[in-house]
């Protein structure tokens, strides 16, 4: 029983340390990375460049990435500044 409790505790600690996020990649201008006219592997390559596990061109024609580190900027409706002055 003690080993089981220890295993569960370690499992939660690992989960807290290895935090990843999913979302749309954002450029310096605050806009999502467009993939409308890009090759099929463009988003997967861009996502791997920022240490994401995988990515694809979503219906909004923007790159969506999975399992990226927390330091990567992602698009958020609340903080959207695309098309606005800096």
UniProtKB/Swiss-Prot annotation:
Disulfide bonds join 31-82, 35-57, 43-63, 47-65. One of its GO terms (biological process) is defense response. Residues 1-20 form the signal peptide. Residues 21-83 form the LCN-type CS-alpha/beta domain. The keyword Methyltransferase does not apply. It comes from the Eukaryota. One of its GO terms (molecular function) is toxin activity. Keywords: Amidation, Disulfide bond, Ion channel impairing toxin, Neurotoxin, Secreted, Signal, Toxin, Voltage-gated sodium channel impairing toxin. SUPFAM superfamilies: Scorpion toxin-like. It is found in: Secreted. The modification Arginine amide is found at residue 84. Pfam families: Toxin_3 (PF00537). Expressed by the venom gland. Beta toxins bind voltage-independently at site-4 of sodium channels (Nav) and shift the voltage of activation toward more negative potentials thereby affecting sodium channel activation and promoting spontaneous and repetitive firing. Strongly affects skeletal muscle channels Nav1.4/SCN4A, poorly affects the neuronal channels Nav1.6/SCN8A and Nav1.2/SCN2A. Induces spastic paralysis of rear limbs, increased salivation, apnea, tachycardia and increased perspiration. Has the structural arrangement of an alpha-helix connected to antiparallel beta-sheets by disulfide bonds (CS-alpha/beta). Negative results: does not affect the cardiac Nav1.5/SCN5A, the peripheral nerve channel Nav1.7/SCN9A, and the voltage-dependent potassium channel Kv1.5/KCNA5. This is Beta-toxin Tz1.
């Amino acid at each position: 029983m003690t080993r089981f409790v220890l295993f569960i505790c370690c499992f939660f600690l690992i989960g807290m340390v290895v935090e990843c996020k999913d979302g749309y990649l954002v450029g310096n201008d605050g806009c999502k990375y467009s993939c409308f006219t890009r090759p099929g592997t463009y988003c997967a390559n861009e996502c791997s460049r920022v240490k994401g596990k995988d990515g694809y061109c979503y219906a909004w024609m923007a790159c969506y990435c999975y399992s990226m580190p927390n330091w990567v900027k992602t698009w958020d409706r609340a903080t959207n500044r695309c098309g606005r002055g800096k």
